[in-house]
């Protein structure tokens, strides 16, 4: 049985000079191929801001996989989905494939794009 580690670094973001917000992710998530992965991100700013999820593979630029909590950009497989509940947002990967092994980052931004 193959295990796919999904690395989830802690990410801290600032919104201008007014305030800083800390978003917390677990250090890692490992799942078997074909299983469902749920990656959470928590932070007090999340009820007031949208969550964005990026996937980054070694040696590559980050790729946006979810925006505005649950929207999926064109070209991103349907197995990627996002949800939000209070101070917690979740990236779900249904039927994890080997190519999904990557670092996943969450960040928050308001509707104007301010982080």
UniProtKB/Swiss-Prot annotation:
Domain of life from the UniProt record: Eukaryota
Record region (Framework-1): 20-41
Region called Complementarity-determining-3, residue ranges: 107-115
PROSITE patterns, A to Z: IG_LIKE
GO CC terms in record: extracellular region; immunoglobulin complex; plasma membrane
Key word Cell membrane present: yes
Organism: Homo sapiens (Human)
Region of interest (Complementarity-determining-2), residue spans: 68-70
Ranges for domain Ig-like: 20-115
Location of the protein in the cell: Secreted; Cell membrane
Main location (coarse class): secreted
Region annotated Framework-3, chain positions: 71-106
Spans annotated as Complementarity-determining-1: 42-50
Signal peptide location: 1-19
Keyword annotations of the record: Adaptive immunity, Cell membrane, Disulfide bond, Immunity, Immunoglobulin, Immunoglobulin domain, Membrane, Secreted, Signal
Official protein name in the record: Immunoglobulin lambda variable 3-16
Cystine pairings recorded for this chain: 41-106
Chain positions covered by the region annotation Framework-2: 51-67
Subunit relationships: Immunoglobulins are composed of two identical heavy chains and two identical light chains; disulfide-linked.
Function: V region of the variable domain of immunoglobulin light chains that participates in the antigen recognition. Immunoglobulins, also known as antibodies, are membrane-bound or secreted glycoproteins produced by B lymphocytes. In the recognition phase of humoral immunity, the membrane-bound immunoglobulins serve as receptors which, upon binding of a specific antigen, trigger the clonal expansion and differentiation of B lymphocytes into immunoglobulins-secreting plasma cells.
GO BP of this protein: adaptive immune response; immune response
Gene3D superfamilies linked: Immunoglobulins
């Amino acid at each position: 049985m193959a295990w796919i580690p999904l690395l989830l670094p802690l990410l801290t973001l600032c919104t201008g000079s007014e305030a800083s917000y800390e978003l917390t992710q677990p250090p890692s998530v490992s799942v078997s191929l074909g299983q469902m992965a749920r990656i959470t991100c928590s932070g007090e700013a999340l009820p007031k801001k949208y969550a964005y999820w990026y996937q980054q593979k070694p040696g590559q630029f980050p790729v946006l996989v979810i925006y505005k909590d649950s929207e999926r950009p064109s070209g991103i497989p349907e197995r990627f989905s996002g949800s939000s509940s209070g101070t917690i947002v979740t990236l779900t990967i249904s039927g994890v494939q080997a190519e999904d092994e990557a670092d996943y980052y969450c960040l928050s931004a308001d509707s104007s794009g301010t982080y």
